Structures are given as C-alpha cells and as structure tokens.
C-alpha cells in the first residue's frame, strides 16, 4: 500500500474554479485506475489557496499508472496552479 499526500497551491481567486474542475477529474481517476484506492482532495480552513490530496494506491504499478495519466487528467487544473507541488510518499506502519 502506498499513500501520497500532495499539496498544491492555486492562484489567487482560483479556488472555486479548481474545485469545479476537481469534481470532474476525481470520478474519472477513480473509474479509470482500479489500483487507486483513495483520491480525495481537501481544502484547508482559512486558506483559499491550498488543496491537499490524500491518495492511496494498491501497489507501485497502480502509482505508475496514475503518474502516467496525471498530465491528461489534470490539464484543465494546471493553469490555475502556482508552480511546484509538495508530494510526500508515505508507507503504512500499522493498519
């Protein structure tokens, strides 16, 4: 099991549009990537620029498939984002 925590920053005034786009993207990812077990974007209270993704993949191959599809799935969102993402790869200790 592989978990990613990805933090993205949207440009000023772009959060509502980013959320609208994510409501399209997330179901597509879940439908087309069976090894993607969780793909949940979050906002942060009091911060209108941050989106945090909680992502869980069954194995390395599932993560590779997601990475290969990332540009296509996120092409509408990328213009709304500030440069750079903070991505942390996590591994479960206890379940």
Where are these regions (language model features)?
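A short acidic, often aromatic-flanked loop/helix-cap motif at beta-alpha or helix-coil junctions
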Residues: 47, 93-95
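Short, surface-exposed ligand-recognition loops at beta-strand->loop->(often short) alpha-helix junctions
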Residues: 10-17
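Short, well-ordered beta-strand segments in beta-rich or mixed alpha/beta enzyme
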Residues: 2-9, 38-67
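An amphipathic, aromatic/His-enriched active-site/gating alpha helix that lines ligand/cofactor pockets
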Residues: 25, 31-32, 36-37, 56-89
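Absolute protein N-terminus
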Residues: 1-2, 95
């Amino acid at each position: 099991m592989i978990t990613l925590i990805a933090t993205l920053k949207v440009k000023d005034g772009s959060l509502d549009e980013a959320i609208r786009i994510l409501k399209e993207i997330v179901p597509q990812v879940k439908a087309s990537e069976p090894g993607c077990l969780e793909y949940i974007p979050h906002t942060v209270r009091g911060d209108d620029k941050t989106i945090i993704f909680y992502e869980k993949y069954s194995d390395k191959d599932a993560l590779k498939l997601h990475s290969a599809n990332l540009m296509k799935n996120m092409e509408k969102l990328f213009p709304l984002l500030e440069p750079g993402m903070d991505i942390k790869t996590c591994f479960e200790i206890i379940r």
